[in-house]
């Protein structure tokens, strides 16, 4: 089941499966494919409040779908404090493989849970805003939102 709604950073599509949100992504498509479930409505409500700086945490049920390595990276990304940034290399070191910064970048690119897994907090070695699946403007917007 999917549900799409508009936000300040673009249309967000939510995917629910088995009572959990398994995907939060920016999309070009607007509208909803079916009547939203209570969980999809709750997730939309929380995300909308988050993007208005009215909420700091999202606490609806999620399920991360990915390889064991991707899930390890995603958990490490969730440890980055709101408003802070870390480099791909620092996250590679955090998961125990200081030479895996490119693999960390690839895991970020496959992140199914925008906002829950904060890939926007990961920056290049020179602290430059690089490598965000939804573009650097969205990355900058999310980082600025978190420091307000």
Which stretches of residues belong to each language-model region?
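Substrate-binding/gating loop at the entrance of the active-site cleft, primarily
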Residues: 80, 111-113
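Short clusters of hydrophobic/aromatic residues that line enzyme substrate/ligand-binding pockets
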Residues: 58-62, 104, 129-132
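Short Lys/Arg-enriched helix C-cap and helix-to-coil transition segments
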Residues: 115-122
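Basic nucleic-acid-binding alpha-helical/helix-turn surface characteristic of O6-alkylguanine DNA
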Residues: 1-99, 145-148
């Amino acid at each position: 089941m999917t549900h799409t709604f508009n936000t300040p950073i673009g249309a967000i599509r939510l995917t629910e499966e088995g009572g959990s949100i398994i995907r939060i992504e920016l999309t070009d498509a607007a509208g909803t494919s079916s009547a939203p479930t209570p969980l999809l409505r709750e997730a939309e409500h929380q995300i909308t409040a988050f993007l208005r700086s009215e909420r700091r945490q999202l606490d609806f049920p999620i399920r991360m779908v990915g390889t064991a390595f991707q899930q390890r990276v995603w958990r490490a990304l969730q440890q980055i404090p709101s408003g802070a940034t870390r480099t791909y290399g620092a996250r590679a070191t955090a998961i125990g493989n200081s030479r895996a910064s490119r693999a960390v970048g690839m895991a970020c690119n496959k992140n199914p849970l925008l906002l829950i897994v904060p890939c926007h907090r990961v920056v290049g070695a020179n602290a430059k805003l690089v490598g965000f699946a939804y573009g650097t403007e969205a990355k900058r917007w999310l980082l600025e939102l978190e420091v307000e």
